[in-house]
Regions:
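Short amphipathic alpha-helical segments and helix-helix/interface helices
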Residues: 68-69, 91, 113, 167-168
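A residue-level signal for beta-strand positions that form part of recognition/binding surfaces
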Residues: 57, 98, 206-208
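Non-catalytic C-terminal accessory region of glycerolipid acyltransferases
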Residues: 2-52, 72, 118, 133-269
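Structural signal for conserved beta-strand scaffold positions within catalytic alpha/beta enzyme cores
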Residues: 62, 101-103, 125, 180, ...
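Pocket-edge structural micro-motifs
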Residues: 62-64, 82, 103, 213, ...
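A short, well-structured juxtamembrane/interface segment
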Residues: 52-77, 83-89
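Short, flexible loop segments at the rims of nucleotide/cofactor-binding pockets, characterized by
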Residues: 55-60, 79, 126-130, 156-157
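Catalytic core of membrane glycerolipid acyltransferases/transacylases, capturing the structured
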Residues: 76-130, 134, 174, 190
Length: 269
């Protein structure tokens, strides 16, 4: 199933406690110097503007929306998982749906959190390296209040495209299903100096969003079971990545753009 419109969020809404309200508010910057506060506000504003500007020119096409709908039935709420390199594409594709995302407690995490909050996301602060348990507890609370969650599943610092256990543990504690998702633009830049080689779509390109069947995690799963679910999630995302790259190749081979533009080469002289 495919289409160009954004998928509708069907998760229930209950209420907001203090943790949930905090996730949707900008964090206090009083612990930072004036220079760092200015940097956070400036960079977050620029990042928001760039994503909004680029995103408004991208035509998104969704495949597998029935899997997202299945994960949202009978009181269930999806736990979105995708690779960190797709964060710009994901932010715009699923904007305005009150999804709560775990963001790093680092300086960089401050402006990323503010940028995504402007698109209607909540942000809990923590990662696999800093404050992860506390952030996971906050995500459990927000999901119990009816809010979906999302993980850049190889973040915040990699290794690139290697699944980490946060989403598995959240699914175990909440009973909600994990939904693997992959994104690919038809034309893009890659930030090769960043650890994840962040994907920046080129203006007026298309973007394919492929959604895999949900993965459920039993509440009594043991350590070996967690490892098995990690492999299942890894395999699902790897398969989605291959499908995305196949779509990109097929799309560009039939594109009306001249070959030298598709290759990123100079115009023939």
């Amino acid at each position: 199933m495919s289409g160009s419109s954004s998928p509708k969020d069907r998760s229930p809404r209950a209420h907001q406690d203090d943790a949930t309200r905090a996730a949707f508010r900008f964090s206090d910057l009083s612990g930072y110097s004036f220079k760092k506060r200015l940097t956070i506000r400036t960079v977050s504003g620029l990042l928001t503007g760039l994503i909004r500007l680029l995103g408004s020119t991208i035509r998104y096409e969704f495949e597998g929306r029935e899997h997202l709908e299945a994960a949202s039935r009978d009181g269930r709420i999806p736990i979105y998982t995708f690779w960190h390199d797709s964060i710009a594409l994901a932010t715009y594709a699923f904007r305005g749906q009150n999804i709560v995302v775990m963001t790093s407690q680092s300086f960089d995490g401050e402006y990323i959190a503010r940028a995504i909050q402007r698109f209607g996301y909540g942000a809990t602060r923590g990662s696999s390296t800093r404050g992860g348990i506390g952030a996971l507890i906050e995500m459990i609370r927000t999901m119990r209040n009816g809010y979906p969650a999302a993980f850049t599943i190889d973040g915040p610092k990699g290794p690139r495209h290697v699944v980490k256990p946060g989403a598995i543990l959240l699914a175990k504690k909440t009973g909600h299903p994990i939904v693997p998702i992959a994104f690919v633009p038809s034309r893009s830049w890659s930030l090769s100096r960043s650890w994840d080689r962040t994907i920046a779509p080129k203006p007026f390109s298309r973007a394919r969003v492929i959604i895999a069947p949900p993965i459920t995690v039993a509440p009594d799963i043991d350590e070996a079971g967690v490892e098995a679910k990690l492999r299942e999630l890894q395999d699902s995302l790897d398969s989605l990545e291959r499908r995305c790259q196949a779509w990109r190749t097929a799309h560009n081979n039939r594109s009306w753009w001249p070959a030298w533009i598709r290759r990123g080469a100079r115009a023939p002289g």
